[in-house]
Design a protein with these regions (language model features):
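Bacterial N-terminal signal peptides that target proteins for export
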Residues: 3-16
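Catalytic cores of phosphodiester-bond hydrolases, prominently lipid phosphodiesterases
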Residues: 28-358
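Basic/polar N-terminal segments that are highly enriched at the extreme N-terminus
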Residues: 1-6, 26-30
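Bacterial N-terminal signal peptides
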Residues: 14-24
Length: 358
């Protein structure tokens, strides 16, 4: 049996309100706030900068209105943490062990050939260095606030070092190998997963990571731990980061096969899988009832308040409200603040994860 009571299955239950009460000093020390009782806002494609005007013109001439969702930019991660009080980030990761795959993208070459006036691209030459790179689509949608995974992790770590009382920060890592051009990204298999974990550990030491082993404890499986005593208390893991593998299917299965129980990333699997602790349910409209059941049973769920810019273009808040009401702990958005070109649409939670630090 769990040491704490199950959360009430009601639409008005607000995890963030519980956080605010604890921070205000009204918590019961015998029943500490658990990590799965948080509700945190984060961004989708958190590194993304919209293509420049020249690139949007080229892409629109080929794909028409399908490129509209690309016209979305995020602030630097530090600003998202500080001003936006966002606590989870999605990063698209490409292998690049030699530093040669993404340093000279087609769309930048076309702009140079045309003499187009575009913002500088990779002025420090970071893409020519070996290491995992962050971008949305090779050659085409390449602008980013962080060119490398190392720099993104280091930026968040620096903020964390200065604000060690923060609740755990979640990184959702999507391991990508797709391309629409002649660039051929490397597959995620074999030693690639060790490379990923080494890059993480080079920035975030093990004692600052909330890993599956920390949740599993002495239970036989991660699922047994979550279904039994539940996720650990927030206060035991302040100042830490947790890493979630966004991929499901074959990439996830290869990661599980290539790593041990001491792996650093949580994986999204079926609820009866031994490694079940979090699940990705991106559509809160279609899976509302399922999300509520998963949350009620102690699993962490990530869902999306909007997708492809549709909600922002029409100022449609239904999906946003359902995402919040579902109780999903990790809510992602492309619009933590309004885009004045589109509408007033944006996503904000009723209560912050912690007081402002500015």
């Amino acid at each position: 049996m769990r040491q704490t009571t199950r959360r009430p299955a009601t639409a008005c239950w607000r995890p963030a309100a519980v956080v605010a009460a604890v921070l205000a000093g009204s918590s019961d020390a015998a029943d500490p706030l658990r990590i799965d009782q948080l509700q945190l806002l984060g961004t989708h494609n958190s590194y993304h900068l919209a293509p420049d005007r020249f690139a949007m013109t080229i892409l629109s001439s080929v794909a028409g209105s399908r490129v509209a969702p690309l016209d979305c930019s995020h602030r630097p991660l530090t600003d998202q943490l500080q001003a936006g009080r966002l606590r989870h980030f999605e990063l698209d990761c490409y292998l690049d062990p030699e530093g040669r795959l993404f340093r000279d993208p087609l769309i930048i070459r076309l702009a140079d050939a045309d003499g187009a006036d575009v913002p500088p691209f990779d002025p420090k030459g970071l893409l020519a260095r070996p290491g995992i790179k962050l971008l949305h689509s090779p050659d085409l949608d390449v602008r980013t606030t962080n060119y490398t995974l190392h720099d993104a992790l280091q930026e968040v770590k620096a903020w964390s070092d200065a604000h060690l009382e923060h609740v755990p920060i979640f990184f959702l890592l999507e391991l990508k190998s797709d391309s629409l051009t002649t660039t051929r990204p490397l597959p995620w298999e074999g030693d690639a997963f060790a490379t990923l974990e080494q890059e993480i550990a080079a920035v975030w030491p093990r004692e600052r990571i909330l890993a599956p082993a920390d949740v599993r404890g002495d239970a036989a499986t991660l699922r047994d731990a979550v279904a039994g005593r539940g996720w650990p208390p927030v206060d035991a893991h302040r100042g830490k980061a947790a890493f979630l593998l966004d991929n499901e299917g074959s990439v996830r299965d290869r990661y599980l096969a290539a790593t041990t129980k001491e792996r650093l990333l949580f994986v999204s699997v079926a609820r009866d899988h031994p490694e079940a602790a979090w699940m990705k349910r991106n559509d809160p409209v279609a899976t509302q009832a399922e999300i509520r059941r998963l949350v009620q049973d102690g699993f962490i769920v990530r869902t999306r308040a909007d997708a492809n810019g549709r909600e922002a273009r029409t100022n449609d808040t239904r999906r946003r409200e359902l995402a919040i009401a579902s109780g999903a702990q990790l809510i992602s958005t492309d619009y933590p603040e309004p885009d004045p070109r589109l509408s007033r649409y944006h996503v904000a939670l009723p209560d912050p994860p912690e007081p402002r630090h500015d």
